């Protein structure tokens, strides 16, 4: 439950868990748009409804359509990342959001995402599982001192490169924009 996110659990918006048929229909629709080979599968942080078995099946269904499969899901256990690799996943994207631990807990007051150490150590679990490609990022605008977050991410990346040197890395710089409905406002606008 992220206080800044429009998808947070208390937002009364309709949510859908796609059936296998709907998943395949989405894949076909994407392929009709252009000859895409890269696919990023994204889920909410709900392991009961969109956990590892669901993600594994979605990966299996994607293989006939796409050659490069990445996921952006809740942080997983090492063995879960390894299992998803067996289903064709070759990359993971995870946003730490902020490295400021005290504020992290304010922005993520409950749920699995509220566990700072579990999230930040997820990158190690990806490396231990031999994930081919890891994408990481902080949410610029969440903290007033955004340069500190970027510096901490750079140190974290350097650590990962030393320990899991076989892995390829990418860095993402998503930024917050002002909310039009008067909700959470960024501390910095870039």
In which residue ranges do the predicted regions lie?
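Radical SAM/AdoMet-radical enzyme domain recognition
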Residues: 38-39, 52-140
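Conserved C-terminal portion of the radical SAM core fold
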Residues: 38-41, 117-182, 190
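Glycine-rich tight-turn/loop motif centered on a GG-T
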Residues: 10-17, 48-53, 104-116, 146, ...
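Short Fe-S-cluster ligation motifs
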Residues: 25-46
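Non-catalytic positions within long, well-ordered alpha-helices that form the structural scaffold/packing
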Residues: 31-34, 85, 127, 158
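Canonical Radical SAM [4Fe-4S] cluster-binding loop centered on the CxxxCxxC motif
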Residues: 1-22
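Short, acidic/polar
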Residues: 20-29, 75-83
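Charged helix-capping and loop-helix junction motifs
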Residues: 22, 52-57, 150-154, 188-190
């Amino acid at each position: 439950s992220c206080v800044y996110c429009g998808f947070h659990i208390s937002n009364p918006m309709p949510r859908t868990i796609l059936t296998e048929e709907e998943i395949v229909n989405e894949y076909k629709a994407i392929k009709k748009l252009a000859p895409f080979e890269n696919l990023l599968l994204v889920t909410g942080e709900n392991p009961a409804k969109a956990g590892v078995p669901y993600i594994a099946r979605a990966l299996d269904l994607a293989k006939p359509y796409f050659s490069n499969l990445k996921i952006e899901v809740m942080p997983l256990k090492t063995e879960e990342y390894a299992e998803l690799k067996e289903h064709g996943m070759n990359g993971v994207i995870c946003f730490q959001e902020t490295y400021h631990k005290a504020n992290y807990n304010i922005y993520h007051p409950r749920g699995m995402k509220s566990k700072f150490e579990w999230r930040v150590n997820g990158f190690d679990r990806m490396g231990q599982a031999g994930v081919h490609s890891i994408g990481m990022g902080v949410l610029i605008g969440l903290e007033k001192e955004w340069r500190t977050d970027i510096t901490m991410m750079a140190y974290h990346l350097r650590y990962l490169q030393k320990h899991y040197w076989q892995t390829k890395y990418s860095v993402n710089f998503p930024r917050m924009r002002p909310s039009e409905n008067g909700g959470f406002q960024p501390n910095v606008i870039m």
